[in-house]
Amino acid sequence: MMSTKAFTLVPAIEREQLLSDRDRGLLECVECCGRNLYVGTSDCFVYHFLLEEKTLPGGSATFTATRQLHRHLGFKKAVSELRAASALSRLLVLCDGCISLVHMLSLEPVPSGARIKGATAFALNENPVSGDPFCVEVCIISVKRRTIQVFLVYEDRVQIVREVSTPEQPLAVAVDGHFLCLALTTQYIILNYSTGAAQDLFPFCSEERRPIVKRIGRQEFLLAGPGGLGMFATVAGISQRAPVRWSENVIGAAVCFPYVVALDDEFITVHSMLDQQQKQTLPFKEGHILQDFEGRVIVATSKGVYILVPLPLEKRIQDLLASHRVEEALVLAKGARRNIPKEKFQVMYRRILLQAGFIQFAQLQFLKAKELFRSGQLDVRELISLYPLLLPTSSSFTRSHPPLHEFADLNQLTQGDQDKVAKCKRFLMSYLNEVRSTEVANGYKEDIDTALLKLYAEADHDSLLDLLVTENFCLLPDSAAWLEKHKKYFALGLLYHYNHQDAAAVQLWVSIVNGDIQDSTRSDLYEYIVDFLTYSTDPDLVWRHADWVLQRSQEVGVQVFTKRPLDEQQSGFNPDDIISCLKKYPQALVKYLEHLVTERRLQKEEYHTHLAVLYLDEVLQQRPCTPDKDAEVTETQAKLRRLLQESDLYRVHFLMDRTRGAGLPLESAILHGKLEQHEEALHILVHELADFPAAEDYCLWRSEGRDPPYRQRLFHLLLAVYLGPGPAAPARTVAAVDLLNRHAVEFDAAQVLQLLPGTWSVQLLRPFLMGAMRDSIHARRTTQVAVGLARSENLIYKYDKMKLKGSSVRLSDEKLCQMCQNPFLEPVFVRYPNGGLVHTHCAASRHTEPSSPSAGART
C-alpha cells in the first residue's frame, strides 16, 4: 500500500457555533447546497449557516460558517434527514415519519402545509424522469411494510405517482431514473419501479452491519457488501469496477473521484477506484455522518461539522507523478476536465501526459512512453536533449520550464547501466524514425534527422544508408564530424552527395578503395563509384576520375562512358574525346568502340574501321606461330567476322591490305565479297579452306536482300568452282551434288545439265531433278493461273463496257446539271454511274456524286 495525501480535514462548524451551553441537542443530519449549510439536531431544530471558503497563502483552505436562522419544527423527535431542492427553494425535512417542506432561507413551512407522511427514509432522484423542471422526484421508504412510494414535490404541494411492493422490508434506498437500489433485510436488489422488474445483487445481513446505498453516477451505485467490501453495481446488476476493501463496520461512504471515502468508528479511509488500494487514513472518532454534496465531502460528529478538502488538483497529480503512479494521475486529470476551462485544461493535461511519458521512459516502458509522448504532442527535442551530443550545436532548443522530468541526461537516468543506455537509444531511433515524416517534426526536422543520423552511425545501423539516400535534413557540419568520428566514410560520402558536393564524395570513396582510409561498408565500392560516375551530370568530375577507374579495371571502368544515359552522351561527352582518352587502355577502347558500333549504331567509317583493326590486331596476337586452319575460333575472331559481314562502313581495301598474308583466309573471303569479288572469295573458301558449308553460307549471305538473278549467279559460280579443276576433286564433286540437291530452286536446270559431267547418273541427281521439275511445273501452273485471272478480269471489264454502251443518253436544252442546276450549253458532260449528268467544270470542282439520277427540269 502506498501513502498518498489526497484530503485534509478542515473544521466547518464547532459545537460552540451550533449550540449554546443550555442546548442539549446533538447533531443528527447535514445538508449542503452551494454556500448554504443546514444542520438538523436531535431536539428537532434546523440551523442554517453560510459557508465561506478561504485559501491561505500556503495553499491550504479554511472555512468560516456564519449562523443565519434556526427553527424548531414543532416535534419532539430528532430531525432524521435534510435534502435541499434548490430549483424550488425548498428544504425537505424528515422528522417523526413526516417530510415537511420549508423555505431554504427563512425556514418557514410552506403556507399550504404540504407534507409527506409515513416515511422512514427518503432519497431525491438526481436523474428525474418526469421532465417537469418545477418539481423534484422523491422516493420514500414507507411505514407500510415492504412498500416504496414515489412522489412529485412542487413548491407548495406533493403528488404520489407510484407505490411499489418489495420482497422484503427496505432499509435504505437510492434512486436513478426508474431504477431503485434497495437494501432489504437480507439482500441488495435493483428494482425498476416502472416495469416492476427486479434484479438480485448479493446477500446482506442487516443484523450484523448498517446498510449503505449511495448513487455515485449515472446508473451506478456504491454498496456496503459482505466481508468489509465496498461493492459497485450498475442498474443492469453487474459491477464494472473491482471492489475496495474497507472496514467491517463502515458507517458512511462517498465517492470523490477517483477516490472512495469511508467512515468507521475511528478512521476516515481513502481508497483508489483505479487500483483499489488504500491511499490515506485520517483519525476521526465519534463520527456518524459522511456524505458528499456536489463534490464536497462532509463528515460530522454529534458536536461538529468538518469538510474533507481535496488537495489542489495539480498538487495531487504532481504527488502521484512523483510517486510514479501514472495511471492514477492521468485518470485524476481527466476527471477534472469538467471543472476547468477548456484551454487551461488542455495545457495542463498535455503537460501531465508528457511528464507521465518521461516517467514511463525512465522505467523503460517504451510503448507506453511513446503513446504518452504522441498524445501530449511532445517537442521531440525534449527527448533528444537527454542524449548527450545528439542535438546539433546550432540548435536553439531549451528545455521546458518547469522541467518535464528530473534527469540531467541519459547517464543519470540509467545510472550508467550501459544495457539500459543501449535500450534507450534503440527506442529513440525507432521513435525518431516514426515521427520524422509527421507533423510532429515540423519546424525542427534538422534536429531530428541529425540526431537520428548520429544514433545510426554510433550503432552501426543499416538504416544509416537508407536515411542518407532519401530526403533528409541532416545538418552537414555536425553530421560530417560525427560520421568521421565513427569512421563511416562511405556514409559521409553519401552525405556530401546529398549536399551537392559530389567531388568530395567521390574523393572520399576513392580513398577507401585505395586503402588510405578504412571502411568495410561496401565490398563493391569500386563498382559503386563507377556506377555513380556513370550517372553523374558533372562531366568534369567524370573526366577527373576516368584514369583512376580505368587503371583499376578497363572492362569495368569503361562503363562510365558506355552505360551513360544517351542524352548525356550526346551533350557532354564527345566520342572522339573519349577515344583519345582510351588510347592508353586497349581493352576499354575496344569495349567503347563496340558500344558505338553495335549499341548506338553510329554510322561513322572511322569507328567501324578502328574497331575492325583492333579486332584484327588482337586476332593476330592470339594466333600461334604456325597457323592451323582447324584451330578453334576465338571470341575476338568471331566478333571480327561478324563485324566484317554486317558492317558496310569500314575501309575494305585498307583491311584487305592488313589481312593479306596474315593467314586469315575466311576474313579475306569476306572482304573479297564486300568488293563483289565473288570468284576470289569462293576460290578461297573451296580450294584453300575446303569449307564447303562456309561457301554455301557465303552465297546466302551475299545474296540476302538481292534479286533472284543475283542469287542464282552466286550459286552458279559456286557450282562452277566445285566442278572446275583443282585439288580434292572427289570431295568437291560430293559438295556439288549436295549443293544441287539442297538448293535446287536456286539453279537454272537447263544451264546446270549442260555443265554436269555425262558420267553422273540420274539417281545421283534425283533430288535436284525432282526439285527442278517441281519448280518448273509450279512456275508453269502459276503462269496459267495468272493468265486465267487476267482473262477473267478483262472479260469483266468488257461486260461493263458493253453495258455502258447499251444505254443511250439524251441531252437537250431542258436537261439541268445536277450540281449547279443550270442547262447544258454544249454536248459535253460527265455521267456518273448512277445516271446523273453534270458539267465537266462542276465535276472537276466537286468530287461528290449527285444524289439523284433523275434529270432536272426547267421551271
UniProtKB/Swiss-Prot annotation:
PROSITE patterns (alphabetical): CHCR, CNH
Q: Which domain of life is it from?
A: Eukaryota
Q: Where are the CHCR repeats?
A: 563-727
Location(s), subcellular: Cytoplasm; Early endosome
One record GO biological process: intracellular protein transport
- The residue ranges of the CNH domain are 24-297
According to its UniProt record, where is this protein mainly located? cytoplasm
Functional description taken from the UniProt entry: Plays a role in the TGF-beta/activin signaling pathway. It associates with inactive heteromeric TGF-beta and activin receptor complexes, mainly through the type II receptor, and is released upon activation of signaling. May recruit SMAD4 to the vicinity of the receptor complex and facilitate its interaction with receptor-regulated Smads, such as SMAD2. Plays a role in vesicle-mediated protein trafficking of the endocytic membrane transport pathway. Believed to act as a component of the putative CORVET endosomal tethering complexes which is proposed to be involved in the Rab5-to-Rab7 endosome conversion probably implicating MON1A/B, and via binding SNAREs and SNARE complexes to mediate tethering and docking events during SNARE-mediated membrane fusion. The CORVET complex is proposed to function as a Rab5 effector to mediate early endosome fusion probably in specific endosome subpopulations.
The entry assigns this protein to a family as follows:
Belongs to the TRAP1 family.
Q: How does it assemble?
A: Interacts with TGFBR2 and ACVR2B; in the absence of ligand stimulation. Interacts with TGFBR1, ACVRL1, BMPR1A and ACVR1B; in the absence of ligand stimulation and to a less extent. Interacts with SMAD4; the interaction seems to be mutually exclusive with the interaction of SMAD4 and phosphorylated SMAD2. May interact with ALOX5. Interacts with RAB5C. Interacts with VPS8, VPS11 and VPS16. Component of the putative class C core vacuole/endosome tethering (CORVET) complex; the core of which composed of the class C Vps proteins VPS11, VPS16, VPS18 and VPS33A, is associated with VPS8 and TGFBRAP1.
Name this polypeptide is given: Transforming growth factor-beta receptor-associated protein 1
The scientific name of the source species is: Bos taurus (Bovine)
